[in-house]
Each structure stands twice: as C-alpha cells, then as structure tokens.
Amino acid sequence: MSIKYSNKINKIRTFALSLVFIGLFIAYLGVFFRENIIIMTTFMMVGFLAVIASTVVYFWIGMLSTKTVQIICPSCDKPTKMLGRVDACMHCNQPLTMDRDLEGKEFDEKYNKKSYKS
C-alpha cells in the first residue's frame, strides 16, 4: 500500500474551506433555536467567527504562498510551489525536495522540522 502525499499549501486551503462549511453549518443550527434568542445568537456568532477564521487562514496562506519557491515537477512538468525542505507536487503528489542531502531518501515530513538533523 503506497502512502498518499499531499502538498502543504493544499492541506491548509482544505482546512480553511472546511472552516467555511463548518461555520455555515453551526450558524444554520441556530435557526432551530428561534424561540431562545440567546442560544440562536450564540450559534450564529460562533458560526460567523468560524467563517471569519477561514478568511484569516486564506489570507495567511495566500501571503505564505507568495514567498514559496516555484519549481517544475519532474513527473508532470507543471509548476508547483515548494514549502519547506520536502513537499509534494500540487498536481501529481510526487514527493519533492530541494535538499541534496535528502535526495533518494524515503519521503517524510519530519525533515521540515528544525529539530531534525540530516
């Protein structure tokens, strides 16, 4: 069984998208408590805060995405963004590294940690 690799930027974008849907769902739950205005308002505010949090996450990953290194994936020949020492292609999920010490080694995201010594 092969391991499914995923690009870090796409993981964060997926998290932000899930925050939007979770926030809308929580706010929608407030409709069922129309009789109690406090509970309804609480649900709607928590849902609204989740949507605002997703906006902050989208803004943050957008700013981070502008600082990343763009490379051409050797497998699919498409441009992809590299975040950290090891990452995966955004299109084909091919494990990538720009560190010569890690070439040929098994893909592991622990290589991105500052505490890791190669």
Swiss-Prot record:
It is a multi-pass membrane protein. The keyword Membrane applies. GO terms for cellular component: plasma membrane. Pfam families: DUF2614. The keyword Cell division does not apply. This is UPF0295 protein BA_0538/GBAA_0538/BAS0506. Belongs to the UPF0295 family. The chain crosses the membrane at residues 12-32, 43-63. It is found in: Cell membrane. It comes from the Bacteria. Keywords: Cell membrane, Membrane, Transmembrane, Transmembrane helix. NCBIfam families: PRK02935.1 (NF002796).
